[in-house]
A protein has these predicted regions:
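Glycine-rich phosphate-binding loops of nucleotide-dependent enzymes
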Residues: 1-188
Length: 188
């Protein structure tokens, strides 16, 4: 169910059309294409040119510049994606989600290859999106991050729902106990 209705999501583009976007742990960019082309891949803005429909590059670059500003990035929309850092590529993926006016953004282990400064930048983007009403599903094993940015924690174990709790007052020990299904005596 999504927004009170039963839905059948068939592929990522279908999910995106419903306002659900995902940034995967393993990014799959097209490094030889521009930032703008990666953001609009498969859904380029178009315009009429005589009897033909063509890609509206001007609109794509303008829209991309606005999106990049919204996710706190200031590089050229025409820049090749392969020239960017991993965290910048991740920001491009977030911009792609924002471009589709996503209402739900799923982030799968988003900090796994980021430096501490890049993590802070990501958290600022997440806070901005939350203020805009975007729901963030943050998948992580990093308890400090979860407790820092989450309003609620939902725990699943072996594909089964365990429970959902407000973050206020939660401890790392409580979360880990629910994740593994037993009390832990030693953490390494």
């Amino acid at each position: 169910y999504y927004e009170g209705e039963k839905v059948n999501i068939t592929d990522p583009l279908d999910a995106l059309s419903k306002g659900i976007a995902m940034v995967h742990q393993e990014l799959q960019p097209v490094p030889a294409r521009s930032v703008a082309e990666n953001i609009y891949l498969g859904r380029y803005p178009t315009k009429k040119f005589g009897p033909f429909t063509v890609v509206d590059h001007e609109k794509m670059y303008e829209d991309t510049a606005a999106l990049l500003k919204r996710v706190r990035m200031n590089f050229d929309p025409k820049q090749k994606l392969g020239e960017l850092s991993v965290s910048q590529m991740q920001s491009v993926e977030i911009a792609k989600a924002v471009s589709a006016n996503c209402k739900v953004l799923i982030l799968d282990e988003p900090t796994s290859s980021l430096t501490s400064n890049e993590v802070e930048a990501l958290f600022r983007i997440i806070e901005d999106l939350k203020k805009e009403g975007v729901s963030i599903v943050y998948i992580s094993h990093k308890m400090d991050e979860i407790l820092r940015i989450s309003d609620e924690v939902t725990i699943m174990r072996d594909g089964q729902y365990i429970g959902t709790w407000d973050c206020e007052g939660l401890t790392t020990d409580f979360i880990i106990t629910k994740m593994v299904g037993r009390e832990l005596t030693n953490l390494y």
